[in-house]
A protein has these predicted regions:
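Canonical Radical SAM [4Fe-4S] cluster-binding loop centered on the CxxxCxxC motif
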Residues: 99-136
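P-loop NTP-binding catalytic core
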Residues: 89-98, 102-103
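Conserved AdoMet/S-adenosylmethionine-binding subsite of the radical SAM
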Residues: 145-152, 157-321
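Ferredoxin-type iron-sulfur electron-transfer modules in oxidoreductases and energy-metabolism complexes
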Residues: 135, 139-147
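Auxiliary Fe-S-binding modules of radical SAM enzymes
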Residues: 1-93, 242-250, 258-352
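Short linear Ser/Thr-Pro motifs
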Residues: 76, 109-110, 191, 213
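Generic beta-strand structural signal
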Residues: 81, 93, 104-108, 116, ...
Length: 352
């Protein structure tokens, strides 16, 4: 993906106007570019037909759109599709399209790999290979074949969004701006384990929904599952969240993978109730999907339902999230591109 040209995808309206100005074009040309990019999703500069041919040629000398189609797609029996997208750095990320009866959700990645190294997550086992620029985050949406069907976007793919906050905020700003996709921020959810200093900034600068990966309410146990607990503990996270209003349109949720014999007891349920008491939130219980060489197990459906019912009866609105795409390794915690990179490059060499 590396070349001498610069990319337009991921630039704000102000930056597009500056591009136009630097090339000797009227400032309003930047607004025209924004519409072609973020509302028409053009694949080439030549498709921007209300910009003069001479100005298009001038623009194309230094810039290109910066959109890249998917390199691979896997289809689940339940309708979920996992796409493999190339990035500008030559690496790959996985993106999951999840259609349902009355909605279609896209799970996007914000990094290649992840630094958080959660015990139960395949992405963490890949290691960290880099943060995505806003253009690569947006490309997962821009180049999605089903882009016109999308109703929701969740930042729950590869990577920790708060560890790439500048680019995540830039991407969500473009998604919600009038010149951009013009989406309501209520259609976007950003997930986090809780990263010190970054979570506070996100809460203040974004109106998108927030999902916190809790997975265990007891700090010492959570630290064993999630090393990030040692940086910003779950109790600190909850105290920070108490400073914000989630009683209206903005939603706060907690993600909780239920592990057999680890975080599924009444002690844990009671600890959750104490921890979030008075906080306007919901809990999503998630089934654990087995990862090779990881000595963790999921619980039965009956146990999940008992845990849900106990929390609900004690005032914590709780649901069990349906698992989607498990047969193509697209479910929660299973995304990884370490193997795929080699497969794609081998295929490219065979085609050469």
């Amino acid at each position: 993906m590396n070349n001498e040209k610069k990319y337009l995808l991921g630039l704000t309206l102000a930056e597009l106007k500056q591009v136009a100005k630097d090339l000797g074009m009227p400032a309003f040309t930047g607004g025209q570019m924004a519409k072609w990019l973020y509302q028409q999703h053009v694949k080439s500069i030549d498709e921007m037909t209300n910009i003069s041919k001479a100005n298009r040629a001038k623009l194309a000398e230094e810039y290109e759109i910066g959109c890249f189609g998917y390199s691979d797609a896997q289809h689940s029996l339940d309708g979920t599709i996992k796409y493999l997208f190339p990035t500008r750095s030559g690496k790959f990320v996985e993106t999951v399209y999840i259609p349902d009866k009355d909605r279609a959700t896209l799970c996007v990645s914000s990094q290649v790999g992840c630094k958080m190294n959660c015990l139960f997550c395949q992405t963490g086992k890949q290691g960290f290979e880099g943060s995505l620029p806003a253009g690569d985050i947006l490309n997962q949406i821009y180049s999605l074949p089903e882009v016109d069907k999308l109703t929701n976007i969740v930042f729950m793919g590869q990577g920790e969004p708060m560890d790439n906050l500048d680019n995540v905020l830039r991407a969500t700003d473009i998604l919600t701006a009038d010149y951009g996709w013009a989406w309501s921020p209520k259609r976007i959810t950003v997930s986090s384990v809780g990263v010190k200093n970054k979570l506070k900034r996100f809460l203040e600068e974004s109106e998108c929904h927030v999902a916190i990966s809790m997975h265990d309410p007891i700090p010492a146990e959570r630290a064993e599952l999630m090393p990030a607990e040692r940086g910003m503990g779950i109790e600190q996270v909850v105290e920070l969240l108490r400073n914000y209003d989630f009683s209206h349109q903005r939603r706060l949720s907690f993600e909780y993978i239920v592990f057999k014999g680890l975080n599924d007891s009444m002690q844990h349920a009671k600890a959750i109730i104490r921890l979030v008491k008075g906080l306007d939130c919901r809990f999503n219980l998630i089934r654990f999907h087995q990862i090779p060489n990881i000595p963790l197990q999921g619980v039965s459906d009956e146990k999940m339902e008992q845990f849900r019912d106990y929390l609900t009866q004690h005032g914590v609105f709780t649901t069990i999230r349906a698992s989607r795409g498990q047969d193509i390794y697209a479910a929660c915690g299973l995304l990884s591109t370490s193997k795929k990179i080699g497969e794609i490059r081998q295929h490219e060499n065979e085609q050469a």
